[in-house]
Amino acid sequence: MSEAVSTALTIAHLNVRAAGTELLRDVSLHLPGGKITVLVGGSGAGKSVLLRLLAGILPRGQSPVYWEGDLRFGDAALESGSHGRTGIVFQQFALFDELTPTANVQFAIDHRADRSQPPRYSSSEWLELLGVPSAPPVAALSGGQKQRLAIARTLAADPDIILYDEPTSGLDAATGHRVAELIQETQRRFERTSLVVTHDYATLLPIADEVLLLDSHNTTIVSVPRDQWSEIPERLKAAAMHSASPASDRTTASTRSWWGVTGDATANAFGNFLGATGAALQAIARLPIDAFPIVPRLRWAGRFLWHFLGLIGGPTACIYLVVAGVIAGFTTTYFTLRFLPFRLYTQPLLIDELLAAIGFALYRILVPILATVLIAARCGAAVAADVGVKQYGGQIDALKTFGIRTPAYLLVPILGAFLIATPILEWLIGLAD
């Protein structure tokens, strides 16, 4: 624990650009070890981008966020990518909904950066320490319980520094103060260096040891002495006013021709198209590598595989395809017999041969085609929705903070689930026909 207390964060000559906009320029700062540092700034100033950068979610020199500079945790200089030295408590918690609270914490324990030492606490002990019930599913937990679970999972990964992303966003004053007390209690009990990123300075300043101000006008971060903390609201307002289109910029924009504005918009759209196309081509080129079944932990790959098997080949998928098969078989047989020429005379003579032909066509042609289309439509939509929820809820970013290649626990299990479930579903729809 003494190592965690002494671990400080030093940033030198940091430059950050996002979508062509300069967010930070030549920033150098020091976060003291074992303290709570609060970083305040206006909305859209780049606070969350900085947090994701420090957490290792944003690799160096890759679109859409480009950054350069030196990061040093204690005596160790870090280049880029997830490094296990920082843990992040996301604004939306980024908990794995398909796992129990105990499994969420155990996931972090099993993916610690340094597994040469035994974990400090078991998953159940972490839940008990943070006051999180283990029985209810994650979706049934209250907002406060989810936040405590997110903190427990972050601590279980044994990071040196804990990052908090807007922990009081959207909360009323009373709840915000309870969250601030929870952060302070966590820091005192576990003695981890903490960086809290927020625009709610009024709630979080009372727990701060140090305060940093992100000046969006000058694209820098400055330390605010304690005797100037009362001036933070005015300094934030001043920075926001200076950043909101100076008069000279408005004059220049108003005198520009329609062709100039349209040309810039077209160039930006074309650049975005080329960027998206390049990213898609890179993803296609990397598919054989990303789909190679190498996973950090076979146990957890199996858990994710089981989750996607439930989406692709679960009871609802089976019922859906069986009903579709019954409908297809019934309609094919009915309309074939219904519209036979001279049905009264030919049906008794051709019934056996006709049914055999219908069965052959269904099993050899229609069933595989129909099953493939239905599986692609229903199961593909289910998987896409699940991955979309993981992206929106921050779960994919949470995987990155644990140093996990996202294809290992997403792409590989999804492909495996389709390979296992598709033949079973096609057999079921054929059986229904």
Across the structure, where does each feature detected by a protein language model lie?
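Conserved beta-strand-loop-alpha-helix hinge in the C-terminal portion
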Residues: 217-251
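Q-loop/switch helix immediately C-terminal to the Walker
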Residues: 92, 99-111
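Catalytic Walker B motif of ABC-type/P-loop ATPase nucleotide-binding domains
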Residues: 162-165
